[in-house]
Amino acid sequence: MKILVISDIHGNASALSAVAKRERDVDATIFLGDAILSGPQSNAVMGLLSELQPAVSLMGNHDVEVLDPALFAGWPPEWVALNTWIIENLDAAVPEVIGKWKCSHDFEIDGLHFFLHHGDIKNGAESPLPDASDATFEILKQGDHSSTVLFGHTHVQFEKLVNGVNFINPGSVGQSRCGKRVACYGIFQDGIYEPRQVDYEPSDWLSDLEKIQ
C-alpha cells in the first residue's frame, strides 16, 4: 500500500498539484493541516484536497483561523488584510469542510499505527524542530503509545527517534524551508517511509497573488 503524507499547503495549489501529479498511484492520503491561509490559491487547494480524498485530515492553527478570524486580528495590518481577503473569497462550503477536520488523532491504516498532530505546541514550549529537546517531542505525542508520530507546522522535513518513537515531519507542500523551491511531502510504501520533494512551476501562484486586492 502506498500512503501520501502531506502538510502545510498554505494556499499553494501549484505545489500541491505537482505532488498529486507525481504520486498519481497513491492508495491513501494523510493531511496534517494548514490548507489555505495565507496563500492566493485557496479554493483550488480545497478542490485538489477533495480529489485526493484524504483518509484523515487535521485542523492546523491556520485552519482554525479560517473559522475564527479574531485569532489573527492582532497581526500586522498587511497580514490581516491578506487573510481577510482570502476568507471573504472562499467558496461557501469551505468553512464547513474545515470544521469537520480533526485535532490530534490516533489513526491506523494498513497495519500501521500513527499518532497525528499538526505540530503546534501551546504553553510556551519550543517548536518541534530537529534540534529541539526530547522533552519537546514528548509533549508533542501527548502520552500516546503509537510508535510513529506524524506532524507538520514547522515546514522542516525531518525524522527524529526519541525514546523509541519515530517522529516524522514530511515538510511543507506550499512553503518549504529546505532552501530551495520544492514541495515537500512523504510516502509510506508497504510500511517503509521515504521523504520526498518535487519541483514546481510558481508562475500561476505568482499570477494569482497579484490578483489579490
Write out the residue ranges for each language-model feature.
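Active-site-proximal beta-strand elements of phosphoester/diester hydrolases
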Residues: 2-10, 113-120, 167-171
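Active-site environment of divalent metal-dependent phosphoester hydrolases
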Residues: 10-15, 37-40, 63-67, 124, ...
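Short acidic-hydrophobic surface loop/beta-edge motif
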Residues: 103-111, 160-162
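Anionic-ligand binding region
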Residues: 131-160, 165-168
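Acidic, His/Gly-rich catalytic cores of divalent-metal-dependent hydrolytic chemistry
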Residues: 160-213
